[in-house]
Amino acid sequence: MAAEYTYRVSAWWTSGRTGLAKCESSPNTIHFSEAAEMGGLEGRWTPEQLLLCALAGSFTTTFHEVARSSKFEYTDLEVEVEGSVRRNRSTGSGFSEILVRPRLTVVSEEQREAGLALLRKTKAMCMISRAITLPQTLEPYVETGKIPVEGWSQQDAAVKLGV
């Protein structure tokens, strides 16, 4: 059964090369700026980073759903997304390539191939990935690690267990 959802985001310039963005479902606003390389401020999110963040977040939540429906257990997933932007004053700047580097941690070596297959399936199913029409390269990595102790963060587990 298909369902349709609508999402709204508003953005407005505040001054110079900076602005604010917000959505209906969150009381928080995001301060953003043009990229520092293009004359914007350091230390603020840029529209380029927000696009990559949307892809990383969507990939993460899509993988969680794919893994859950496949009854695949994992201990951690970190998704790094890198985008290359070409600046062209006559035609406008644009992304030339996006690299998606998911790092999946599983309990046993026997899960490695299944984990890789689910990462590839996630790329095909990810809503934001499908919405971006430029080339995207998936560079998945699956590693084995220990199961963190209940209540520990992944960072705590990495430090305390040597994961």
Language-model-detected regions and their locations in the chain:
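Extended beta-strand/beta-hairpin segments
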Residues: 1-53, 64-163
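Alpha-helical metal-binding/catalytic segments enriched in His/Glu/Asp
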Residues: 58-59
